[in-house]
Amino acid sequence: MSRLKASLDEYVALKDYLNPERDRNYIIERSGVDPRFFRWYFQNVMVQDFRVWRANLRIEEAKRIIMATPDVSMNALAMRLGFGTSQNFYHHFKKVVGQTPTEFMETCGTNRPE
């Protein structure tokens, strides 16, 4: 279990979650754990699916970027965060935060310049 935990910690520290190619198989290979154990670990220890966990990490990064760079393009941000499309990004952002990225900017007082 400690090998997997160490691999997950490294995955977060290096922001590998932003790279769409760094998926669950990448972590399984790096940690050397069995895929069934990986699934068990996320279900029972993390109490969420890997994809949900990774999307949450990406959304937290999105919030940091939006607050620091209010004029950021949502399309560019979606690609930078590994969401692929702005629609996918908006869907996950609203699901996690309860607001669209634009609403989040307005709430935080980081209005986009007109």
Model-predicted segments: where are they?
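Sequence-specific DNA-binding recognition helix
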Residues: 69-105
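Short, leucine-enriched amphipathic alpha-helices that occur as contiguous helical runs
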Residues: 1-9, 55-63, 86
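Hydrophobic alpha-helical packing segments in soluble, helical-rich domains
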Residues: 7-9, 24-35
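Inter-domain helical "communication" segments and dimerization helices
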Residues: 1-19, 36-37, 109-114
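Terminal helix-turn-helix DNA-binding modules in bacterial transcription factors
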Residues: 44-80, 107-114
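Basic, amphipathic alpha-helical hairpins
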Residues: 5-22, 42, 46, 63-72, ...
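HTH DNA-binding helix-turn interface
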Residues: 35, 39-53, 83-84, 93-102
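Short alpha-helical "recognition helix" segments of helix-turn-helix
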Residues: 27-28, 38, 77-78
